[in-house]
């Protein structure tokens, strides 16, 4: 093949591109020995006066076929004409590419046999022209993008587009000058491959007549990998785990895929990947700088054109289109090309049978049930019900087995094992439920396989022999709503939908044989069981549970299930989520806590008033549950955006007298510029906690809030304003609240730049006789030692303040000395003092030790993250041994202490009768130091109950010593990070 190509190709065109001096130099090089090729030179007598035409003939004469080209290309480089070398290489590749021809034949067949367009190709190209342009532009040199992701839900056309671009490349109509080799990898076909190499994987489709496949890797920038089928991938891919750059080495399949996706293997190559909803969650984060192309489906005009092409006859197409358009939910579903095909197929067969133009479209389950009954009726009329039932059950068993085992292409053996003959397989192909895949079979679409898998549970009987590969109803419910999302999630959602009396009745009427009536009861029992186990209850994915409940459209069933749960977390990211959440939440009667994230709903930038008003309708419906549910107490919203109208609806509901809300938590919430929130706080007498952590507040917002808090009707006791961008300028407003609101007991201002100026204002209020604050959290507030004199005055004056958090402020030794002077005063009532990360040294410990001896009220002292060293710890331990010391908790985590002071710590553990908790976390103690501590812990006089220590950070022998002590002392717990959760909760970072 190579010889015929070179003889036809012709050198003359390239020689004519040489300038006079370049051509002369070219001839001079030809007269020299060609040692690299082990060829003799062409005699100078023949070359000297030879024209370009003559030289072309001489090259062909002396170096026949491919040799002439190898010599010519080598000489082009020597005369600095790399442009000609590059162009010739590219043309040679294009001509010498049997692989491209092989792919053209393969994908032409796939396009004709396996793609369900039912429309002219020019219509398809017109609907996808924007995506085509994006794909073409994505891989240009200017774009510098090597990874492109096609994103869209199932049925939107991702696979169809990938097949089309593969065919277009093979035909030379796309990326002609960009990619020499394009490989189409259907990753679900790799489920059965344990170990291979990339070279071996690609060799499966490599024509024997082509060049060595190894040669293609010399220019990886000319390679594109098209990857599809991630939804059906059986194994999980890991981020940066055991990646490899060796395309020759055999290794586990997940490593090869992970290495390609993360650009460890062939980093200069390009990727084109299709990801649906599930695969986006599992794999998108692994990609490096991907360009995202979203497939949006059909517009209204494209839907109309699709109907026209599908039905052919214009009057019939228009009649069906108008019918579907008048059916709102059904028309919305038809933006998805596959769903549109389902609808058209259902309607067409009904019309052909002379039936009414009717299709139930309450939800997706109804649509698939209608499709199944329509095609089943068309192909099974000549068989008795018993035979039809057996055949349908066998088909659904095949689908279920495939989903549970991640099998999507079925051999004749697979069919036989599930009770299907080859002729029955052909029958299902005729009904458009299966399709041919070479000598095997596959379902027409993954969604159809998922629906048929759900139908298996409606068709199976208790006496049937179990298939060990297919999970039970209980296992499917758990897989749907507890485990991470898999294909079983959608099967479970379909199972919810087909369990309803209405759908069971519809299916029985159409099929002509009875179906299980117990499915819904079994689902209910499974969910009740999950709700009663704390671990399962906390792991429930309410997003999926709500979708399943919504599919039933049975209010009584939804109410019964939702009454199993008192706490729900739900994410609302689009209008569909909002519709489903509003439907389910309004049927919750026992719900006490709702944790909710609302994104991409409000504000609405679409410009469509009707769509926006529709969102507000469903939002109002959702918020109504705060009024109707008498048990509701906690609303926790995080990472949420609300505009003024949506906030007004929420606040109106929360302000109703019948709303029993006790805690309102807004974490990182944007709520516009309306003060409705604060009015709701004022008018709800049950509300005791308000948290706005991470929510940016303007000075105006703070002033509105403070006016609310000063009102006699306000009942707020805990106020969390951490990380709210509060500066010293508004501290006067906050101070005015402290001075007059005797109900406020807890205030967190962590992570705000209050500075010393703001602290001075707060301290004046804290000294006020009406101030009843008990806990004040001021971590990361940009305070210095300057504030300590004012704080000291508060410690002397305040009779209510029991916990003061000054962590992560630069108080330094001199600042703490001022605090200690106040702490030693008998009138000081503080019980907990947090001084972590306050830039303290051992110099401060003398003053602190004196406090421990004389202040019997101080129970907790946290000094972690300070450079107090062994010297400082010794002073503290001496104080702990004093009989007047009543300290119960001491925090020293990450303090740079060594074995040298462990004897002092041990002595303190034995002598101090009140010390219950000691935190030594993140301290690099050696084995000898641990032995000393363990001996003290084992002493009968040691009263310690909690030791903060990172056990797994020690060697195996030391870990055994620590575990042995824990086992020997029942009241002792040794744990890592023992106070973190409690500290976060008190500060309001996590509630």
Curated annotation (Swiss-Prot):
* Any one GO molecular-function label of the UniProt entry: ATP binding
Spans of the LRR repeats are: 743-763, 772-793, 800-820, 829-850, 857-877, 886-907
The UniProt entry, under Pfam families, shows:
LRR_6 (PF13516), NACHT (PF05729), NLRC4_HD2 (PF17776), NOD2_WH (PF17779), PYRIN (PF02758)
Where is each Pyrin domain found?
Answer: 1-94
Could you tell me which InterPro entries the record lists for this protein?
DAPIN, DEATH-like_dom_sf, Leu-rich_rpt, LRR_dom_sf, NACHT_NTPase, NLRP_HD2, NLRP_innate_immun_reg, NOD1/2_WH
Chain ranges passing through the membrane = none
- PROSITE patterns for this protein: DAPIN, NACHT
Factors inducing expression = In brain pericytes, up-regulated at the mRNA level in response to oxidative stress.
The UniProt record gives the binding positions of ATP as: 152-159
GO aspect biological process, one term: defense response to virus
Alphabetical GO CC annotations of the entry are:
canonical inflammasome complex; cytoplasm
Which controlled-vocabulary keywords does the entry list? ATP-binding, Cytoplasm, Immunity, Inflammasome, Inflammatory response, Innate immunity, Leucine-rich repeat, Nucleotide-binding, Repeat
Query: Any idea where the NACHT domain is?
Result: 146-465
Tissue expression remark? Expressed in ileum intestinal epithelial cells. Not detected in peripheral blood mononuclear cells. Expressed in cerebral endothelial cells and, at much lower levels, in brain pericytes.
Subunit details: Sensor component of NLRP9 inflammasomes. Inflammasomes are supramolecular complexes that assemble in the cytosol in response to pathogens, such as rotavirus, and play critical roles in innate immunity and inflammation. The core of NLRP9 inflammasomes consists of a signal sensor component (NLRP9), an adapter (ASC/PYCARD), which recruits an effector pro-inflammatory caspase (CASP1). Within the complex, NLRP9 and PYCARD interact via their respective DAPIN/pyrin domains.
Q: What does this protein do?
A: As the sensor component of the NLRP9 inflammasome, plays a crucial role in innate immunity and inflammation. In response to pathogens, including rotavirus, initiates the formation of the inflammasome polymeric complex, made of NLRP9, PYCARD and CASP1. Recruitment of proCASP1 to the inflammasome promotes its activation and CASP1-catalyzed IL1B and IL18 maturation and release in the extracellular milieu. The active cytokines stimulate inflammatory responses. Inflammasomes can also induce pyroptosis, an inflammatory form of programmed cell death.
Q: Which family does it belong to?
A: Belongs to the NLRP family.
Name under which the protein is recorded: NACHT, LRR and PYD domains-containing protein 9
């Amino acid at each position: 093949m190579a010889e015929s190509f070179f003889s036809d190709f012709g050198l003359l065109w390239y020689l004519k591109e040489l300038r006079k001096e370049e051509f002369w130099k070219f001839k001079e090089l030809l007269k020299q020995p060609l040692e690299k090729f082990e060829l003799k030179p062409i005699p100078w007598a023949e070359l000297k006066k030879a024209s370009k035409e003559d030289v072309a003939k001489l090259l062909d004469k002396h170096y026949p076929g491919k040799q002439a080209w190898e010599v010519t290309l080598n000489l082009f480089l020597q005369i600095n004409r790399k442009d000609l070398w590059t162009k010739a290489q590219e043309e040679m590749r294009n001509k010498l590419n049997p692989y491209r021809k092989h792919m053209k034949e393969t994908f032409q067949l796939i396009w004709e046999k396996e793609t369900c367009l039912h429309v002219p190709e020019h219509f398809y190209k017109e609907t996808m022209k924007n995506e085509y342009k994006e794909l073409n532009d994505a891989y240009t040199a200017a774009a510098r993008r090597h990874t492109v992701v096609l994103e869209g839900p199932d049925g939107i056309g991702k696979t169809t587009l990938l097949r089309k671009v593969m065919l277009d490349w093979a035909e030379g109509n796309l990326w002609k000058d960009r990619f020499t080799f394009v490989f189409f990898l259907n990753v679900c076909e790799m489920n059965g491959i344990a170990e291979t190499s990339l070279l071996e994987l690609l060799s499966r489709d490599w024509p024997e007549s082509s060049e060595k496949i190894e040669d293609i890797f010399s220019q990886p920038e000319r390679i594109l990998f098209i990857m599809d089928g991630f939804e059906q991938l059986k194994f999980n891919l890991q981020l940066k785990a055991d990646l490899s750059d060796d395309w020759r080495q055999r290794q586990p399949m997940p490593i090869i895929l992970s290495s390609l996706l993360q650009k460890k293997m062939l980093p200069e190559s390009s990727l084109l990947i299709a990801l649906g909803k599930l695969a986006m969650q599992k794999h998108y984060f692994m990609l490096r700088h991907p360009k995202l192309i979203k497939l949006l489906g059909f517009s209204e005009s494209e839907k109309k054109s699709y109907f026209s092409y599908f039905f052919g006859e214009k009057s019939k197409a228009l009649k069906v289109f108008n019918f579907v358009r008048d059916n709102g939910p059904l028309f919305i579903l038809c933006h998805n090309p596959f769903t549109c095909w389902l609808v058209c197929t259902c309607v067409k067969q009904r019309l052909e049978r002379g039936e009414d133009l009717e299709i139930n479209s309450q939800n997706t389950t109804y649509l698939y049930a209608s499709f199944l009954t329509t095609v089943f009726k068309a192909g099974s009329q000549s068989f008795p019900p018993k035979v039809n039932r057996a055949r349908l059950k066998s088909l659904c068993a095949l689908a279920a087995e495939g989903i549970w085992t991640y099998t999507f292409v079925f051999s004749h053996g697979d069919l036989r094992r599930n009770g299907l003959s080859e002729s029955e397989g052909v029958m299902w192909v005729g009904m458009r439920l299966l399709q041919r895949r070479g000598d095997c079979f596959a379902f027409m679409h993954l969604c159809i396989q998922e629906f048929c898998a759900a139908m298996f549970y409606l068709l199976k009987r208790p006496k049937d022999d179990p298939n060990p590969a297919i999970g039970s109803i209980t296992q499917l419910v758990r897989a749907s709503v507890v485990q991470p999302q898999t294909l079983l999630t959608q099967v479970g959602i379909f199972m919810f939908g087909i369990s309803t009396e209405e759908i069971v009745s519809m299916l029985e009427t159409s099929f002509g044989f009875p179906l299980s009536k117990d499915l819904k009861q079994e689902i209910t029992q499974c969910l009740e069981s999950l709700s009663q186990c704390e671990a399962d209850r906390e792991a429930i994915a309410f997003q999926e549970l709500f979708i399943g409940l919504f599919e039933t459209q049975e209010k009584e069933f939804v109410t019964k299930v939702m009454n199993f749960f008192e706490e729900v977390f739900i994410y609302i990211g689009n209008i569909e989520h909002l519709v489903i959440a509003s439907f389910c939440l309004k049927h919750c009667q026992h719900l006490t806590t709702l944790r909710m994230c609302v994104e991409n709903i409000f504000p609405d930038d679409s410009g469509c008033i009707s769509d926006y008003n529709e969102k507000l309708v469903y939002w109002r419906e959702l918020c109504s549950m705060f009024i109707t549910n008498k048990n509701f107490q906690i609303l926790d919203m995080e990472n949420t955006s609300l505009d003024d109208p949506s906030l007004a609806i929420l606040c109106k509901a929360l302000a109703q007298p019948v709303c029993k809300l006790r805690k309102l938590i807004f974490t990182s919430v944007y709520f516009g510029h309306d003060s409705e929130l604060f009015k709701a706080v004022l008018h709800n007498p049950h509300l005791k906690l308000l948290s706005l952590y991470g929510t940016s507040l303007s000075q105006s917002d703070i002033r509105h809030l403070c006016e609310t808090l000063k009102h006699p009707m306000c009942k707020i006791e805990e106020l969390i304003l951490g990380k709210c961008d509060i500066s010293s300028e508004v501290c006067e407003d906050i101070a005015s609240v402290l001075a007059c609101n005797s109900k406020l007991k807890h205030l967190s201002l962590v992570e705000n730049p209050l500075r010393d100026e703001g602290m001075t204002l707060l301290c004046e209020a804290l000294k006020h006789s009406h101030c009843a604050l008990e806990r004040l959290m001021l971590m990361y507030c940009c305070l210095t030692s300057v504030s300590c004199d004012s704080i000291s005055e508060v410690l002397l004056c305040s009779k209510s303040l029991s916990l003061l958090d000054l962590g992560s402020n630069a108080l330094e030794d001199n600042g703490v000395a001022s605090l200690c002077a106040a702490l030693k005063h008998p009138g000081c009532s503080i019980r907990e003092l947090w001084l972590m990360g306050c830039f303290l040294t051992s110099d401060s410990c003398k003053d602190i030790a004196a406090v421990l001896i004389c202040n019997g009220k101080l129970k907790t002292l946290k000094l972690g993250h300070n450079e107090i060293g062994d010297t400082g710890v010794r002073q503290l331990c001496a104080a702990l041994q004093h009989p007047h010391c009543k300290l119960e908790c001491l925090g020293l985590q990450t303090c740079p202490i060594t074995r040298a002071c462990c004897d002092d710590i041990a002595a303190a553990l034995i002598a101090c009768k009140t010390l219950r908790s000691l935190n030594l976390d993140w301290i690099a103690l050696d084995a000898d130091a641990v032995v000393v501590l363990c001996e003290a812990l084992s002493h009968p006089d040691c009263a310690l109950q909690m030791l903060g220590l990172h056990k797994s950070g020690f060697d195996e022998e030391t870990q055994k010593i620590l575990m042995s002590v824990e086992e020997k002392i029942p009241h002792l717990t040794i744990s890592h990070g023992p106070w973190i959760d409690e500290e976060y909760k008190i500060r309001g970072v996590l509630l």
